[in-house]
Amino acid sequence: MNKIVFEYLFEAVEINSVVSLEYRHTTDNAQAILVKTKHGDSYKIAVIRYKPDSDCATTNNKVFEAHDAGLVISTKHYAAAIPWDEIAALYTEAVKN
């Protein structure tokens, strides 16, 4: 994973809040997760799965973890794994704009 790409994503999500997450229903036990940039562009980047037994404190609590395969985003009831190549594509698109 390119360190600059990761730092950009981390800054966008954790510090500047220029990227927000939106959930869209797709099936009974899964929803699409969208990344929305500050310019209003939405990118479908993963499918998240319902996890009823979560130990996150609140619904709004988001946890971001970097793994070899990609970025893992967890909320109280959902978890999504986003491949690094899709994050790099999102970063490249954002830079073009």
Model-derived features: where do they sit?
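Short linear proline/tyrosine/threonine-rich motifs used for host-factor recruitment
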Residues: 21, 33-35, 47, 57, ...
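Short beta-strand-initiation
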Residues: 28-30, 68, 77
